[in-house]
A protein has these predicted regions:
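Short, Lys/Arg-enriched N-terminal segments with co-localized hydrophobic residues
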Residues: 1-12
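Active-site-facing substrate-recognition patch
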Residues: 12-73
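Phosphate/pyrophosphate-binding loops at sites that engage ATP/ADP/AMP, CoA/4′-phosphopantetheine
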Residues: 66-77, 157-163
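Short glycine-rich phosphate-binding loop at a beta-alpha junction
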Residues: 75-86
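Short, glycine/charge-rich flexible loops or terminal/linker lids adjacent to PRPP-binding catalytic cores
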Residues: 90-136, 147-151
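A contiguous pocket-lining binding segment that forms or flanks enzyme active sites
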Residues: 125-170, 176
Length: 232
């Protein structure tokens, strides 16, 4: 599904959230059933951004991210940082979409799993090389525990030559699972904001998904049984 931009560059808030939820389901990115997560924990739903595999899907995905970033952070940023590996196509697709929708050129950057020690683009980063004065938005698919930011944050700050030289404007993810992070009573995104001091936002929350597919839906995707599991 391709977005139909308004004069301001995107859809109204509720419309784009509803369409994004349908887009995730149609793309087989968001699934409901009985899943075992990497942590070993059971979950009634599973999200895999690696299922976005076609050009049209990535083109559309970039537009949803671009609007969410614009709505949450405005134009107060220069760089999209997508942690390797899944964050790389997210950063690329969104930088393209942001230029198209809002007329602002945004650079993309990612980290390398292994630092390159030769060539003109050697170093720990892929794409644009972040430096002092840059304003960065971190872009990821989803965060369950907030552990990924523990790796990403120091990699970005390591590029500074003066303390505070690089500003992290915020983080954006596809879905806020709204689950407690570890032993905390807060969600992973709330924990990130509290610990690092920048806002962590999502295109949609799990509550948005439930409202669209269960409360307002026909319960064919989120059944009564799955809803009960989500509520546990």
């Amino acid at each position: 599904r391709i977005l139909s931009p308004t004069k301001q560059g995107g859809l109204d808030m509720e419309a784009y959230k509803q369409e994004f939820i349908e887009f995730m389901v149609d793309s087989q990115v968001l699934k409901f059933g009985d899943f075992t997560l990497k942590s070993g924990r059971k979950s009634p739903f599973f999200m895999n951004a690696g299922a976005y595999i076609t050009g049209s899907q990535l083109f559309t995905l970039g537009k949803y991210y671009a609007q969410a970033i614009h709505d949450n952070f405005g134009d107060d940023f220069d760089v999209l940082f997508g942690p390797a590996y899944k964050g790389i196509p997210l950063a690329v697709a969104t930088s393209i979409a942001y230029s198209q929708l809002y007329g602002k050129e945004v650079k993309y950057c990612s980290d390398r799993k292994e630092e390159k020690d030769h060539g003109a683009d050697k170093g720990a980063l892929l794409g644009y090389k972040i430096k002092d004065g840059d304003r960065v938005v971190i872009i990821e698919d989803v965060t369950t525990s907030g552990k990924s930011i523990e790796e990403t944050y120091p990699k970005i700050k390591a590029q500074e030559t003066t303390e505070g030289g690089i500003k992290i404007v915020g983080e954006i993810v596809s879905l806020n699972r709204m689950e407690k992070a570890g032993d905390s009573d807060e969600s992973a995104l709330d924990t990130i904001t509290k610990k690092y001091g920048f806002p962590a936002k999502a295109i949609v929350t799990m509550q948005d998904v439930i409202e669209e597919l269960y409360t307002n839906g026909d319960k064919s995707i989120i059944t009564d049984q799955i809803k009960a599991e989500i509520d546990k």
